[in-house]
């Protein structure tokens, strides 16, 4: 039995070392038809800027469900958004009141616009809120639901 364990250990160490990959890519084209860049135009208020940064991260995560590819400044489409209002509310109050208290509600209001080569092709105002329940809802839920709605607009689901 000890010999079998030694053989398996040797195989376990040597077999992964015998694998590898090599790739050569020659390309003279670029896919710029469905590239998009995200531009945060939120004001200089630090609380709103932090919310804008979190929303941008959530939008980047949601882009994988659309036909767009995230690119830099030379992208064909530019998604510009601005956080107009952000109130995280009180999660503890939402848990305690089971979402009944209006003052504990977390709210996020965003204006977004899609530009194609400098021309606006669509604009939306997205309102997201978390009112509570047993878990109270998290601040990230605000950003995730707003980003999902923006991605739905980009896909043309509305």
List PLM regions with ranges.
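Structured catalytic/translocation cores of nucleotide/phosphate-coupled proteins
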Residues: 55, 59, 81-83, 108, ...
